[in-house]
A protein has these predicted regions:
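Structured, hydrophobic secondary-structure cores that serve as assembly/anchoring elements
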Residues: 42-326
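Small/polar, repeat-rich beta-turn/loop motifs that tile beta-strand-dominated architectures
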Residues: 1-35, 42, 119, 123, ...
Length: 326
């Protein structure tokens, strides 16, 4: 047989070496420039109130302009702002950046910080380093859809499936430093990447140490609005019929949260329930006749949101053979 096609290869020498792989921002074209931080923030306006509660992020952008915009949007729309740091930041850099920014803000319980960046496998088995907000948002979605707004998206609940590692090694000491600086660490635990914190960026640790407190309130606010929408333009009669209907719908919203563990019930020393972890008031005191004459009906809801067990302490006492076990 005679080959009809031959491929010949030869080795040549050259003085130039292959160029290193690097990111390049194109310029001089007609498709515009890279968006500015202000333009990215403006884009948040497309996420209208009708989308309900949720989380927002601008991965890859770490300026205070972006953080300001995300927080303002979250407060206005009852959402959570997921914030991260430049991949080159150290633990101390990130704590400084977070604390400096938090000191200039209010309502920071609507935001959560996450560090460090994460790694995952790209095309051709390459390793990519990316901002962690997408990973956090995915685990948040799973936790809330499978359990509820009170479920922390941390620990085993955040075990990664496709994330292969983290850009900066984080040990327990680092995690504690980050936690004290209002930042949730991302760590490798038992061979898997996990979010190892459930705190908000709030300095009001009595009420909003945990991001789940704000998550539950966001859920209640948005769901209450939906459930009461059908009662708008109801007749206000002397029997206060609309009062009862408003109260029933709010209880119908809150009771499942209590039953499933999202609200913390109070019991006395004998195990008798003191309260259900929530209260609903639609009373004459809240609704004087002069107010009803203007068409406004007011209700008052109180809730006690369940907490998060982010630390388990065990005391182990060793006894000798002649002593009783403590």
């Amino acid at each position: 047989a005679v080959a009809t096609i031959y491929i010949s290869a030869s080795v040549n020498t050259a003085s130039a070496t292959l160029g290193a792989s690097a990111g390049l921002q194109l310029s001089g074209g007609t498709d515009g420039d890279a968006p500015t931080a202000a333009q990215l923030v403006t884009g948040l306006d497309l996420f209208e109130t009708t989308y309900g509660a949720g989380a927002v992020a601008i991965p890859g952008s770490y300026s205070t302009t972006v953080w300001d915009g995300l927080l303002a949007h979250a407060v206005d729309k009852n959402r959570i702002a997921l914030l991260a740091f430049d991949p080159t930041n150290t633990v101390d850099d990130s704590v400084t950046d977070a604390e400096d920014w938090i000191g200039t803000q209010t309502n920071t319980e609507y935001a959560g910080f996450y560090y460090p960046s994460i790694t995952m496998t790209g095309s051709a088995e390459t390793s990519l380093t990316i901002s962690p907000e997408g990973y956090v948002a995915a685990k948040r979605s799973i936790a809330q859809n499978s359990v509820g707004a009170w479920q922390a998206y941390a620990g085993l609940n955040s075990k990664a499936g496709f994330v292969t590692g983290i850009s900066t090694p984080i040990d327990k000491a680092d995690s504690d430093v980050l936690d004290a600086g209002y930042i949730n660490a991302i760590r490798v635990i038992q061979g898997s990447v996990r979010i190892y914190g459930a705190r908000s960026a709030s300095t009001d640790i009595t009420n909003f140490r945990y991001i789940t407190a704000r998550e539950v309130l966001n859920y209640i606010v948005t769901e209450a609005e939906k459930r009461l929408e059908d009662l708008v333009f109801s007749t206000i009669d002397g029997r206060r019929t609309v009062f009862g209907r408003v109260e029933a719908r709010l209880i119908g919203l809150l009771e499942p949260l209590r039953r499933e563990g999202g609200l913390y019930e109070a019991f006395d020393s004998e195990g008798n329930q003191v309260d259900a972890g929530y209260s609903v008031l639609v009373t004459d005191a809240l609704n004087p006749v002069t107010q009803l004459a203007t068409g406004t009906v007011k209700a008052k809801v109180g809730v006690r949101v369940s907490s998060v067990a982010d630390r388990i302490e065990i005391e182990i006492v060793k006894s000798n053979l002649t002593a009783s076990v403590v």
